[in-house]
Amino acid sequence: MEVIMAKDWSNCKTIYTIGATNHSEEVRASEDYYATEPKAVEVLLEAEKFCPVIWEPACGEGHMSEVLKKHGHIVTSTDLVDRGYGDISDFLNSDFKVEKCDIITNPPYKYALEFCQRAIDVLDDGHKVAMFLRLQFLESKRRKQFFLDNPPKIVYVSSSRLHCARNGNFSDATGSKSNAVAYAWFVWEKGYQGTTSLKWIN
């Protein structure tokens, strides 16, 4: 495994509310790792077209990357933490980038806004960013200016709940495959300054 660059920005073993009240005392997964079920990528690809080259900068154990490869994409997979898949690279602080690519990922919850901004910054005009985020990412004064400056081209809301699993464990009940959180795909196109469309998928 090639080490591109790593810097520990993720020392975040902190308690956060992650959904309904029955989850309010749960501890965030190690390094904020919640794997995305492959179906989430499948429904995105049914709704949205992407360029052949994809960068997945928070690849975890490759759940998203493998679906993208199955659909014929050339995928560069990186992550701050070595989980046995992809290359080690600090997306927020490294100079590493993939040329002429689109970016598709589920960013760490604590750094979601920073991931969105960084992804838009490193892309070439006309290329896309697709972030799998909680629907409530639309809220907050902190993110308002970001959305005004960088309006998503489209937000795909899942009409059926899609799942994330703590530490990538979808088979174990302790993996927190929970229906308590509503997710959406936020899609930006570099340079787009129009109105954000809202569509339903799944």
Regions from the PLM with identified roles:
Residues 1-202:
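Class I S-adenosyl-L-methionine-dependent methyltransferase catalytic core
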